[in-house]
């Protein structure tokens, strides 16, 4: 052992000495150094150029339109647009070979995954693996973070098994609908804006922060009550995120019950919606993620009645932060669902802001209109955040004016002086609740806990799931929000006249129309599209110039003697 160690040491020292000699020789050869530094040996540019690599990747990249057929335009926002699409591989997904083989690799996300979701999981896996390992788009596979944990565990003692209706109680009609849905899988494609008015080539700033956050979080998070990201496309400086499609959202459902006449949402349906929302929010918060934009338009409902939280564009992690929340995003949450601590100018906040938004959604499901429908004050030219006086006053009129006793450290908020200028209001939440048609005292109790002024005392998502509103009563909480309904909600409105995604790959800057200068050689040029030959116009102009020239010369001759006389 000693001899082998000595030999190894000798070999290592010999290698180091030879390496040093080689470096010395290179230093001698490279006598023409700049600033006393040996120039770095670089390969030929033909070897390390990026152009062939980009060309090869662009040629191998699968286009979003090659894989999906766009059906129509759904909605738009500050982020971009959302389109409904179906997979061009749907016929292949219905085959037994592809679907059955991939269904084994796809695991259900929660205990609520019924027969439909398991069957769709196989088809969903087929969609993701349709192009094999050579596909250049980003697949949002499963949960890659070991820290992420799902609450929906059958062994979780906190969730009473008696309050969950099993998915095996579906009737035959729903089973037939699920079988039909297997042949055609629909998706929602979210296209992010990356340019301004077609001048992306001049002012392209890269991928937005919102898109980066949503891509990063959606690839990690995996819960049955969050919209599932299928894959991501990067094409022509545009981001395309493909999600599972949800036929409804809460805004659409609320509008259906409030127009043309007011029809209350069934209490059993509201309870199912709230339980699933809180379950998804609980999963986010347990994994240190704030949503920061919860509202009815961002709460999706699938055809199977599963509630899914979507639009994580404003979401962010709140663990191990290097700066306050306010530094990154000064304005978060839509104004009607914004927590009072945000309205008072809090520079840092907690997951309690999401629970306030959930309380506002709960009240809107009961009353069929926003409970705090204020008017938003817009930012000025200096981009300073204005004080939302009208919105805060709407809250005070229903919940009453907070006091330092009910809300400690209230005086420390930046906008406390503005709050002190308002008149004193009394708590009127019970009156609003009964006028809106609410009858369940447990629902009113949960609403009080969610709309608590003090963010420290505001109930969190885990404890809200244990509230008596969900555990009390004979009717259990069902997984399908449409359970027991004798009517159907209309499908999403699809616009087929606004499919600019179909022009994919034609992102060119808007070039102003070229102004063609008139030339004497162009005999076919026209004036104003009237077909007037420019040669004729030129001849007429020359004749007019000649006539005017003769008259002007004659008049100049007549005027010249007079000028001489004046002199």
Swiss-Prot record:
Chain intervals with Basic and acidic residues compositional bias: 167-179
Keywords for this protein: Activator, ATP-binding, Kinase, Magnesium, Metal-binding, Nucleotide-binding, Nucleus, Repressor, Serine/threonine-protein kinase, Transcription, Transcription regulation, Transferase
Cofactor names: Mg(2+)
GO molecular function: ATP binding; cyclin-dependent protein serine/threonine kinase activity; metal ion binding; protein serine kinase activity; RNA polymerase II CTD heptapeptide repeat kinase activity
Gene Ontology CC, one term: mediator complex
Quaternary data: Component of the SRB8-11 complex, a regulatory module of the Mediator complex.
Gene Ontology BP terms: negative regulation of filamentous growth; negative regulation of transcription by RNA polymerase II; nuclear-transcribed mRNA catabolic process, non-stop decay; positive regulation of transcription by RNA polymerase II; protein destabilization
Enzyme Commission number(s) from the entry: 2.7.11.22, 2.7.11.23
Family: Belongs to the protein kinase superfamily. CMGC Ser/Thr protein kinase family. CDC2/CDKX subfamily.
Catalysed reactions, as listed in the record: L-seryl-[protein] + ATP = O-phospho-L-seryl-[protein] + ADP + H(+); L-threonyl-[protein] + ATP = O-phospho-L-threonyl-[protein] + ADP + H(+); [DNA-directed RNA polymerase] + ATP = phospho-[DNA-directed RNA polymerase] + ADP + H(+)
Spans through the membrane: none
Low complexity composition bias: residue spans: 90-101, 546-556
Active-site residues annotated for this sequence: 293
Native source organism of the sequence: Candida glabrata (strain ATCC 2001 / BCRC 20586 / JCM 3761 / NBRC 0622 / NRRL Y-65 / CBS 138)
Classification via Gene3D superfamilies: Phosphorylase Kinase, domain 1, Transferase(Phosphotransferase) domain 1
Function: Component of the SRB8-11 complex. The SRB8-11 complex is a regulatory module of the Mediator complex which is itself involved in regulation of basal and activated RNA polymerase II-dependent transcription. The SRB8-11 complex may be involved in the transcriptional repression of a subset of genes regulated by Mediator. It may inhibit the association of the Mediator complex with RNA polymerase II to form the holoenzyme complex. The SRB8-11 complex phosphorylates the C-terminal domain (CTD) of the largest subunit of RNA polymerase II.
Domain Protein kinase: 68-470
Protein's gene: SSN3
Region (Disordered): 88-179, 546-567
Biased composition (Polar residues): 102-122, 133-150
Lineage of the organism: Eukaryota, Fungi, Dikarya, Ascomycota, Saccharomycotina
PROSITE patterns (alphabetical): PROTEIN_KINASE_DOM, PROTEIN_KINASE_ST
Protein's recorded name: Serine/threonine-protein kinase SSN3
């Amino acid at each position: 052992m000693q001899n082998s160690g000595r030999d190894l040491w000798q070999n290592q020292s010999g290698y180091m000495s030879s390496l040093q000699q080689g470096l010395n020789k290179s230093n001698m050869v490279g006598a023409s150094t700049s600033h006393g530094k040996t120039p770095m040996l670089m390969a030929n540019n033909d070897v390390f150029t990026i152009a062939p690599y980009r060309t090869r990747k662009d040629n191998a990249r699968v286009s979003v339109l090659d894989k999906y057929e766009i059906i129509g335009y759904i909605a738009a926002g500050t982020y971009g647009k959302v389109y409904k699409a179906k997979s061009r591989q749907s016929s292949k997904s219905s085959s037994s070979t592809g679907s059955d083989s991939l269904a084994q690799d796809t695991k259900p996300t929660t205990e609520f995954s019924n027969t439909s979701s398991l069957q769709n999981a196989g088809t969903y896996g087929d969609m993701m693996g349709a192009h094999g390992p050579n596909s250049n788009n980003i697949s949002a596979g499963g949960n890659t973070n070991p820290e992420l944990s799902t609450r929906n565990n059958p062994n979780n003692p906190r969730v009473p098994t008696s309050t969950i209706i099993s998915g095996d109680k579906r009737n035959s009609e729903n089973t037939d609908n699920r079988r039909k849905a297997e042949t055609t899988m629909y998706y929602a494609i979210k296209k992010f804006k990356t340019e301004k008015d077609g001048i992306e080539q001049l002012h392209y700033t890269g991928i937005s922060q919102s898109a980066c956050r949503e891509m990063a979080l959606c690839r990690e998070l995996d819960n049955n009550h969050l919209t599932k990201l299928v894959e991501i496309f990067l094409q022509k400086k545009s981001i395309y995120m493909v999600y599972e499609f949800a036929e409804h959202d809460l805004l659409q459902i609320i509008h259906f019950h409030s127009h043309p006449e007011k029809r209350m949402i069934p209490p059993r349906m509201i309870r199912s919606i709230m339980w699933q929302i809180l379950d998804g929010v609980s999963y986010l918060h347990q994994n240190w993620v704030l949503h920061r934009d919860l509202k009815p338009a961002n709460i999706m409902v699938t055809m199977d009645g599963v509630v899914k939280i979507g639009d994580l564009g404003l979401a962010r992690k709140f663990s191990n932060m290097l700066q306050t929340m306010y530094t990154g995003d000064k304005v978060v949450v839509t104004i009607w669902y914004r927590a009072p601590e945000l309205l008072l100018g809090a520079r840092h906040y907690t997951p309690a802001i999401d629970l306030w938004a959930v309380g506002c959604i709960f009240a809107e499901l009961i009353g069929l209109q926003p409970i705090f429908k204020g008017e938003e004050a817009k930012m000025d030219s200096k981009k300073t955040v204005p004080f939302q006086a009208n919105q805060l006053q709407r809250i005070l009129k229903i919940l009453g004016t907070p006091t330092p006793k009910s809300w400690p450290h209230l005086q420390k908020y930046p906008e406390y002086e503005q709050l002190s200028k308002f008149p004193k209001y009394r708590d009127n939440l019970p009156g609003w609740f009964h006028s809106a048609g609410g009858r369940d005292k447990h629902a009113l109790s949960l609403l009080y806990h969610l709309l608590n002024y003090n963010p420290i005392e505001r109930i969190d998502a885990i404890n809200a799931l244990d509230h008596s509103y969900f555990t009390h009563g004979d009717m259990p909480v069902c997984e399908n929000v449409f359970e027991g309904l004798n009517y159907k909600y209309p499908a999403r409105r699809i616009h087929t006249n606004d499919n600019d995604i179909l022009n994919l790959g034609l992102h060119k800057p808007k070039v102003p129309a070229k102004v063609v200068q008139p030339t004497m050689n162009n005999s076919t040029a026209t004036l104003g599209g009237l077909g007037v030959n420019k040669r004729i116009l030129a001849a007429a102009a020359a004749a007019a110039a000649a006539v005017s020239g003769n008259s002007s010369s004659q008049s100049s001759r007549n005027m010249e003697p007079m000028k001489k006389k004046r002199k």
